[in-house]
């Protein structure tokens, strides 16, 4: 009886090691490794995910940057911007891997906007549009390059869609001044440049 239990333990251990070695993530998504306390909003895994309209509204990076932002960063989806998918065309000026995803800096006609593609390992079973988000990651990384934690220039032109997200208001170059982002990115078409 003890021998059977030992054999089962070894088989389970080998299966876990094989899954880890093959690149499959075995850890459960969490705030510590997937973008902080708002990771559920950032991955479309939050309680309000079903209220998001996934059919994108076409707009511009500049128009998103002009939207009135909430006084505090919302912890739940309470604004129209957060309950809508948006589609813009822009140039990816640079990108980098950061906690929980791949941050793209988009530029068009003098305006900037950040868009974030979550790491596939940060998508939970509750993530809405999970296959689409994972496909965006695969397409961008497969077509462009392998991301690192350092900023990398790119110059690719993309038609990109994502869910509205309010982050911290930033005064740095490359971010929308009102804190608006597309997070998560749910669709991407690389027009040129990768």
Sequence positions of predicted segments:
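OB-fold and OB-like single-stranded nucleic-acid-recognition modules
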Residues: 24-194
């Amino acid at each position: 009886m003890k021998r059977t239990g030992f054999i089962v333990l070894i088989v389970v251990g080998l299966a876990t090691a094989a899954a880890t070695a093959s690149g499959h993530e075995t850890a459960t998504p969490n705030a510590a490794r997937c973008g902080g306390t708002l990771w559920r909003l950032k991955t479309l895994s939050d309680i309000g995910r079903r209220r998001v309209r996934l059919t994108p509204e076409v707009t511009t990076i500049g128009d998103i940057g002009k939207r009135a932002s909430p006084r505090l960063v919302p912890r739940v989806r309470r604004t129209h911007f957060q309950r809508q998918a948006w589609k813009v065309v822009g140039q990816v000026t640079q990108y980098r891997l950061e906690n929980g995803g791949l941050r793209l800096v988009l530029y068009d006609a003098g305006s900037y906007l950040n868009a974030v593609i979550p790491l596939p390992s940060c998508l939970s079973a509750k993530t809405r549009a999970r296959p689409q988000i994972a496909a965006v990651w695969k397409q961008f990384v497969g077509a462009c390059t392998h991301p690192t934690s350092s900023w990398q220039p790119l110059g690719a032109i993309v038609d990109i869609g994502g869910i509205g997200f309010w982050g911290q208001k930033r005064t740095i170059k490359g971010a929308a001044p009102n804190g608006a982002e597309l997070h998560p990115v749910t669709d991407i078409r690389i027009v040129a440049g990768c």
